[in-house]
Every structure is written in C-alpha cells, then in structure tokens.
A protein has these predicted regions:
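Active-site loop/oxyanion-hole signature of alpha/beta-hydrolase fold enzymes
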Residues: 1-27, 59, 192
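Active-site acidic short loop of glycosyltransferases
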Residues: 13-19, 40-41, 141-142, 169
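Short helix immediately C-terminal to the catalytic nucleophile in hydrolase catalytic domains
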Residues: 28, 32-36
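Flexible "cap/lid" loop of the alpha/beta hydrolase fold
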Residues: 37, 44-77
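Conserved alpha/beta-hydrolase catalytic His-Asp/Glu region
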Residues: 81-138
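Conserved serine/cysteine hydrolase catalytic core
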Residues: 118-165
Length: 202
C-alpha cells in the first residue's frame, strides 16, 4: 500500500495535479490513508470506503474467501454473460459481498466478474499487504471520513474495523444494509458523504 501510494502520487504530479481529494474502496481506501500520511500538503480530503489495513492483527496468508472468489471468477468468465441471468449464479457470486445482491444490476455483476477474472495483479497486491496494517498519523487539517457497511463480510467488524488505527479526527460512519462495496449498496449516502467531506456541500 505504501509503494502504491507513492506511485499514484508521482503519477498525479506527472499529470500536473498537485492537490486532490481522495476516494478509495478496500485496498484503495488504505492507499488513500497512506497518501495523506506521506503527502499531507497535497491531499485535500479523504473518503475511505471499507478501507483495508485497519486490523490489529495483520493477515499472514491469503484470505480464503478472497481466494475462492478470484478462482471462481476466473473459472466462469466465459459463462458469466449467460449465467448471471439466473438468480442462483448471482447469489453465488455476490451474496457475501452485498446484502442487497438481488438489487445489483446485470451489468454491474458482469463487469465485476470480468474485472476479477482479469485482475492479474490481484494476488501480488494481496501478498504485498500481508503482515502490514495502517499505523501512521494523518494531520487533523485533512478532512477524513471512513465508511463501513454493517454487513461487511470481507473486512468484518470484529477483526478489521479497528477505530484506534484511524485518524483521531476522522468521521466514522456505518451504513445499514451495506456490504464491502458501499457505493453499490448505498450510492446516495456515499455520494452525500463524499460531497460533505470535500466541502462541496456543508
């Protein structure tokens, strides 16, 4: 996560973007936190959606559920366009990710399946975070909002949502009927919090 934070920041500087609001989900949320810790003069706000890294005891091996989902996606990529028309297939793929899996659109499910199947960097990225957690300080001058869902089975409350590791000034929100991808389950609420955190609305 730290090296990715440096890489993203370097790429933004190359593009001439020196100040930015950050929004990221899961590993992306962790990267946002790392960027703010390392480049406080550049980061204007953070909205971290179910960020990884907020665990007291870091993972030492690949999370079994994530391994299963990755292999499942790889195995059904060619079948997905037809299979996802059926409720049973949608349930297998998305029930653990979203409590509102029935409401997810066909297009979203297909895109997510194809993205997972084609993500050659998935396991290298996962392996790179083993034994690590987010444990840095972020200045209180950077508005920070952390959003988790109450039904996040990927980063569950008991082990992966440690508030003591979050910036002390962070606004911490738990959305109802929401899983590991809050922008899927609660898009209006997530959008509202992003706008509030960035200062677009008060």
């Amino acid at each position: 996560p730290t090296s990715l934070a440096h890489l993203v920041t370097e790429n933004l500087h190359t593009l001439g973007v020196d100040e930015f609001h950050l929004v990221g989900n899961s590993l992306g949320g962790w990267i946002c936190l790392e960027m703010a810790a390392s480049y406080p003069e550049n980061v204007k706000s953070i909205t971290a959606l179910a960020p990884a890294g907020l665990w007291l005891t870091p993972f030492t091996s690949r999370y079994p559920g994530e391994v299963a989902l990755r292999f499942m996606a790889s195995g059904v990529e060619k079948l997905a366009p037809s299979a996802l028309n059926y409720t049973w297939a949608k349930k297998i793929g998305f029930e653990t990710v979203s409590p509102r899996w029935r409401e997810l659109s066909y297009e979203l499910c297909l895109d997510a399946t194809n993205a997972m199947a084609g993500s050659t960097g998935y396991f290298p990225a996962w392996d790179a975070l083993l034994g690590k957690r987010f444990d840095k300080q972020i200045t209180a001058s950077i508005p920070t909002t952390i959003i988790f869902g109450d039904s996040d089975h990927t980063l569950p409350f008991k082990t992966c949502q440690e508030r003591s590791l979050a910036p002390i000034h962070a606004k911490w929100i738990v959305l109802p009927q929401t899983g590991h991808v809050p922008m899927w389950d609660s898009p209006n609420e997530v959008t509202s919090e992003i706008m509030s955190t960035t200062g677009v609305i008060k």
